Curated annotation (Swiss-Prot):
Residues 13-76 form the S5 DRBM domain. Coiled coil: none annotated. HAMAP family: Ribosomal_uS5_B (MF_01307_B). It comes from the Bacteria. Belongs to the universal ribosomal protein uS5 family. This is Small ribosomal subunit protein uS5. One of its GO terms (molecular function) is rRNA binding. The keyword Magnesium does not apply. The N-terminal domain interacts with the head of the 30S subunit; the C-terminal domain interacts with the body and contacts protein S4. The interaction surface between S4 and S5 is involved in control of translational fidelity. With S4 and S12 plays an important role in translational accuracy.
Length: 165
């Protein structure tokens, strides 16, 4: 389930709801519902973040999740020509994620959650496979970990102390 909100026009961040979960606690007077939401925020140019929040009302959970996502923004600088520079295999808890670069025109070949994250990051051509756990939070954390471990040619040259004349 994905909903789109553009509440902050000035910062050009787009907000998507990845997962909404309803929890029920049975009390003496009946059932008491609470909601949790996993929110993704990005500008499709390399900045993105995610937030998780709980509240007694769905709208409050979504708002709090969006605020948490804006506080958790990261920048991905190693996106060259709409794809990633190299293959990466990352795992977080039980979720394992494989990202492979693709030729221009391929598009995003991935599952729904990973596709949304890659779109919001600004990736145009990539092949991704989610292995292991289907837990949404672990998949999102694995995707962020994979995108942050990417390094472009210049970064590798700097680490190896290769001077380009």
């Amino acid at each position: 389930m994905t909903l789109s909100r553009n509440s902050h026009k000035e910062d050009q961040l787009e907000e998507k709801v990845l997962v909404v979960n309803r929890c029920c606690k049975v009390v003496k007077g009946g059932r008491k519902f609470s909601f949790s939401a996993l929110i993704l925020v990005g500008d499709r140019k390399g900045r993105l973040g995610f937030g998780f929040a709980k509240a007694n009302e769905l709208t409050d959970a979504i708002r709090k999740g969006g605020d948490a996502a804006r506080k958790n923004l990261v920048s991905i600088n190693s996106l060259e020509g709409g794809s990633i520079p190299h293959e990466v295999l990352v795992n977080h808890d039980g979720a394992e994620l494989l990202l492979k670069p693709a030729k221009p025109g391929t598009g995003i070949v991935a599952g729904s959650r990973i596709r949304l994250i890659l779109e919001m990051a600004g990736v145009k051509d990539i092949v991704a496979k989610s292995l292991g756990s289907n837990n949404p939070m672990n998949q999102v954390k694995a995707a962020f970990k994979a995108l942050l471990t990417l390094s472009c040619k210049d970064d590798i040259m700097k680490r190896r102390a290769v001077i380009n004349d």
